[in-house]
């Protein structure tokens, strides 16, 4: 018995700020869509140059401002990680970088020196509209080339406030509005307009269930890792979630493999080591909804869930709100 999509084939495109975001935020949706025969693509806006590096071996990849022996080669290294992650998720197109590889740079966090870099994706510049216009036109070109019915990106707050995440949200919605307006005005029969935009979010109840039992069993937390303090992981109330995508064991395994591919950024406690990080951590999370545990460079424990949560960001006129849900519905044959 095999699963097939209940609806016609579509193209799903995720627009993300940095390499690894496509996996952490939307990896399950992309893997499931591909398994069901849909086309999937990812547009990455920067190379993630400001990321911290897990493990000792490749600390010198970061900039000299972060590490005395820093070489500033992290962005290039993360291209290779992104390639492997996309392969694990089944993404056929890419890597695709907004405006081309290296056009835009990781801005870092609010108030950092890096956000004033001339190529910073969310650069603090006047007039800000000029920067936005350039990025929107580049994204429109990608949309017209890839022709996605569904676009996945962040909510207006970027998920946790990162300037690049918020900028990705802005350009997605501005691009869709411009395309929708051009189509309505009859600017050209060849103008492709997506059907739906969804925002990836971390749902509070799902996250809490994935962490269930860890406080009562300290041995379940990998050595050297910590549990998140209250509010340390940004979540949204379950009442605000419009779509929950449940992944099969195959989908979750694909996301987990993609997470391992981003070894400089993600540490998966699944008993495996890598060239980047020789240290091994194992986990046996008590919660049934958590496949394994992982952390970023901050060593804060998080669960790899068997689902992802989304909010509706925009739906084209005449398109049902459950458009993407229908596309991911499975029928057994």
UniProtKB/Swiss-Prot annotation:
Keyword annotations of the record: Hydrolase, Metal-binding, Zinc
Gene3D superfamilies, sorted: LmbE-like
The protein's Enzyme Commission number: 3.5.1.103
Coiled coil regions, renumbered to chain: none
Cofactor(s) named in the record: Zn(2+)
Entry's Gene Ontology BP terms: mycothiol biosynthetic process
UniProt GO MF annotations: N-acetylglucosaminylinositol deacetylase activity; zinc ion binding
Cofactor note: Binds 1 zinc ion per subunit.
Annotated Zn(2+) binding sites: 18, 21, 165
InterPro entries: GlcNAc_PI_deacetylase-related, LmbE-like_dom_sf, Mycothiol_biosynthesis_MshB
Reaction(s) the record says it catalyses: 1D-myo-inositol 2-acetamido-2-deoxy-alpha-D-glucopyranoside + H2O = 1D-myo-inositol 2-amino-2-deoxy-alpha-D-glucopyranoside + acetate
Role this protein plays: Catalyzes the deacetylation of 1D-myo-inositol 2-acetamido-2-deoxy-alpha-D-glucopyranoside (GlcNAc-Ins) in the mycothiol biosynthesis pathway.
Similarity field: Belongs to the MshB deacetylase family.
Name the UniProt record assigns to this protein: 1D-myo-inositol 2-acetamido-2-deoxy-alpha-D-glucopyranoside deacetylase
UniProt source species: Corynebacterium jeikeium (strain K411)
Gene that this polypeptide is encoded by: mshB
């Amino acid at each position: 018995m095999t699963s097939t999509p209940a609806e016609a084939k579509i193209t799903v495109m995720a627009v993300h700020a940095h390499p690894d975001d496509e996996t952490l935020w939307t990896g399950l949706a992309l893997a499931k869509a591909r398994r069901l025969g849909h086309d999937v693509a990812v547009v990455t806006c920067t190379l993630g140059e400001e990321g911290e590096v897990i493990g000792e071996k490749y600390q010198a990849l970061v900039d000299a401002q972060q590490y005395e022996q820093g070489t500033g080669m992290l962005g290039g290294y993360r291209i290779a990680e992104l390639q492997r992650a996309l392969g694990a998720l089944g993404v056929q197109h890419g890597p695709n970088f907004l405006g081309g590889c290296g056009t835009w740079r990781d801005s870092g966090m609010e108030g950092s020196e890096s956000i004033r870099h001339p190529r910073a994706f969310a650069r603090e510049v006047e007039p800000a509209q000029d920067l936005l216009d350039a990025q929107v036109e580049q994204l429109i070109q990608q949309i017209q080339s890839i022709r996605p019915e569904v676009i996945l990106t962040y909510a207006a707050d970027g998920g946790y406030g990162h300037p690049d995440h918020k900028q990705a949200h802005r350009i997605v919605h501005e691009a869709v509005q411009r395309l929708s307006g051009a189509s309505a005005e009859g600017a050209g029969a060849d103008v492709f307009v997506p059907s739906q935009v969804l925002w990836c979010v971390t749902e509070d109840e799902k996250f809490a269930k994935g962490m269930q039992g860890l406080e009562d069993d300290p041995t379940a937390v990998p050595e050297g890792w910590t549990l998140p303090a209250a509010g340390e992981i940004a979540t949204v109330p379950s009442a605000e979630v419009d779509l929950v995508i449940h992944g099969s064991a195959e989908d979750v395994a694909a996301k987990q493999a993609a997470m391992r591919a981003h070894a400089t950024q993600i540490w998966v406690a699944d008993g495996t080591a890598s060239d980047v990080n020789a240290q091994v951590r194992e986990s046996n999370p008590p919660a049934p909804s958590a496949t394994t545990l992982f952390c970023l460079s901050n060593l804060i424990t998080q669960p790899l869930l068997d689902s992802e949560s989304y909010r509706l960001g925009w739906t084209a006129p005449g398109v049902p709100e459950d458009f993407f849900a229908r596309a991911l519905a499975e029928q057994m044959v």
